[in-house]
């Protein structure tokens, strides 16, 4: 699977219960920055806690949002519970659910998760309850696929091809009536009123997320999906208040952040995933990401999840181990906001060094956690072999290495 394939009104009582649980955990931190944590009992840097507002992660390891393409009508099912459960028991600190459509048309495929209606809440709550019961923090990535919507899932006979309208597909939308790639219809260019409706959908989805038990919310503004397509000059050719200048191109992002932050309790962290550079001349740049991250910090965003690419097939991406960590490091240093590093982070020493050297506050693992849900346990053993790894008691009793 390539990286693009990885994407991936509440009851008042449910929201209040979620907010109360988060508030009781720890003192409120309101400056939007991650709290510095000293090593606990000589733990490796990767295993120090991370405090974001009123939520404390048990370590610096996060599961990157990865589409499972296993939903019907947006509903979570047993697969999603098992996917998250395995990694929560494996020791992951923050588990981010896949790109979850804030509208039916906001899904990448007909088989992606959704949170556009209240009926989605109970099934998602099964996921969050299990994660929370096993020491993980459940988070969700809210998304709209934009011009990349209505695609077949990657294990379909015609992977990633456009799903025709007569087969249950839908019309993609974007900032401009401009197609990404060669197949599928020309997207519908959103009106200003329709853009504001999507912003409202993000806020409504955030409210449902709280009712479902998610304690961290991330907005997906990367990889050529709707949010990123407004930011990138390669995809946004509008001439109104949502296109043209830098200030106009970041308007949709800032308005969405304000709308979501307004419905979240003060103790709930808000993350934003950015494609920090398009890797194409004339596109969105790292300088742009630094500047918008400064603005996001002032709007109450707590961490920038630093990815890249997705706006152009001509991108020259220097793929290699930790290749996006320098993006996270610069934004962390110059924008004064916590960051997450993602992309080909596979080795425990590599991940630990990213934290130790101040390149990022969090490391997000994708494929490596698909290969090994217990990667955190393996990482602990590699980094601190003389001490028993923090393994769930249901497993620990049977493993000699936990009784040293």
Model features per residue range: what roles?
Residues 7-15, 28-404:
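Flavin-dependent oxidoreductase catalytic cores
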Residues 1-5:
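Twin-arginine (Tat) signal peptide motif
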Residues 18-25:
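C-terminal segment of classical bacterial N-terminal signal peptides
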């Amino acid at each position: 699977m390539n990286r693009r394939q990885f994407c991936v009104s509440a009851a008042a009582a449910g929201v209040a219960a979620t907010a109360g649980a988060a508030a009781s955990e720890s003192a409120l931190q309101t400056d939007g920055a991650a709290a510095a944590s000293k090593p606990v009992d000589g733990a490796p840097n990767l295993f120090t806690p991370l405090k974001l507002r009123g939520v404390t992660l048990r370590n610096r390891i996060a599961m990157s949002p990865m589409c499972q393409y296993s939903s019907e009508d947006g509903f979570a099912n047993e697969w999603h519970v098992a996917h998250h459960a395995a990694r929560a028991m494996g020791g992951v600190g923050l588990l981010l659910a896949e790109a979850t459509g804030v509208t039916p048309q906001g899904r990448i495929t007909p088989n992606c998760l959704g949170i556009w209606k209240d009926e989605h809440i109970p099934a998602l709550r099964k996921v969050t309850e299990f994660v929370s019961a096993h020491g993980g923090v459940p988070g969700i990535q809210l998304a709209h696929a934009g011009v990349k919507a209505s695609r077949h899932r990657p294990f379909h006979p015609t992977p990633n091809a456009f799903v025709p309208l007569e087969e249950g597909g839908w019309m993609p939308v974007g900032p401009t009536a401009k197609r990404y790639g060669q197949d599928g219809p020309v997207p519908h260019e959103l009106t200003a009123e329709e853009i504001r409706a999507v912003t409202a959908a993000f806020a409504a989805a955030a409210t449902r997320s709280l009712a479902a038990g998610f304690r961290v919310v991330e907005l997906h503004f990367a990889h050529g999906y709707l949010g990123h397509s407004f930011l990138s000059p390669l995809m946004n050719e509008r001439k109104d208040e949502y296109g043209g200048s830098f200030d106009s191109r970041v308007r949709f992002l800032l308005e969405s952040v304000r709308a979501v932050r307004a419905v979240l309790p003060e103790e709930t962290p808000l993350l934003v995933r950015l494609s920090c550079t398009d890797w194409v001349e004339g596109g969105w740049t790292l300088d742009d990401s630094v500047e918008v991250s400064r603005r996001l910090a002032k709007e109450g965003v707590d961490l920038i999840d630093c990815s890249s690419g997705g706006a152009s097939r001509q991108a020259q991406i220097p793929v290699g181990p930790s290749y996006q960590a320098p993006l996270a490091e610069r934004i962390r240093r110059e924008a004064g906001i916590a960051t997450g590093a993602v992309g080909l982070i596979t080795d425990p020493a590599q991940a630990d060094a990213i934290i130790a050297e101040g390149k990022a506050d969090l490391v997000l693992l994708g494929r490596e956690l698909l290969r090994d849900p217990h990667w955190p346990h393996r990482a602990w053993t590699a980094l601190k072999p003389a001490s028993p790894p923090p393994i769930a008691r249901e497993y620990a009793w049977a493993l000699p290495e936990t009784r040293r």
